[in-house]
Amino acid sequence: MTHGFDKDFWERHWQQGPGSMGGNPPNPYLARETSGLTPGTALDAGCGGGAEAIWLASHGWHVTAADISSEALARAAERAATSGASERLRWVEADLSVWRPDERFDLVMTHYAHPAMPQLDFYHRIAGWVAPGGTLLIVGHLHTPGSTGHGHHPLAEASVTSAAVTARMDGMDWEIVTADEHFRTLTGDGGRAVPLQDVVVRATRRR
């Protein structure tokens, strides 16, 4: 399988203007899944325009936000400058298929991030960056029978199921808290309805 989600792909994506969704509000699952957590250190793996990272920082977390696109990070930092939480944010330009952080985090999250590697391998990789007792939050595109694609993303590379994600987690190491699949609609450019099919997995690392 080939993977087109390289740096050039994401720089083009973020240079497209409003359609790249840099000004969108944070993902609605974020508040629901983290409301009971004590703020600590967090990694946003594939932070894009920074909405989720900024939201976390605004709620007391110290966030490392990593993305392969310098254009995305520039937009995110500009947005953060008016948030009142920029001192709790660190922006890192990184290829998440090869980069490794120098610490583990109380929360590792990713929202619709697609590096140049198989999707499930990516989730397995970032799971290793969660500290004992910490939380992994994955929000991704749901693969459903009969689907033909999700936006500009090749379906086979961009979508998963909750069962496929949790199957990669050793039951001795993880407690699965959430493993949901949702269908929702958001308003896109020009007021058009955009259907989304989401996978939401939250797990706590036991050790």
Regions found by a protein language model. Give the residues of each.
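Conserved beta-strand signature within the Rossmann-like core of class I S-adenosyl-L-methionine
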Residues: 133-141
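A short SAM/SAH-binding and catalytic strip from SAM-dependent methyltransferases
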Residues: 106-120
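Conserved SAM-binding strand-loop segment of SAM-dependent methyltransferases
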Residues: 84-96
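A short glycine-rich, Lys/Arg-flanked "PGG" loop and its adjoining helix->strand segment in the class I
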Residues: 121-132
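Conserved class I S-adenosyl-L-methionine
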Residues: 1-37, 40-48
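Conserved SAM/SAH-binding beta-strand->alpha-helix loop
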Residues: 69-71
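Conserved SAM-binding loop
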Residues: 76-77
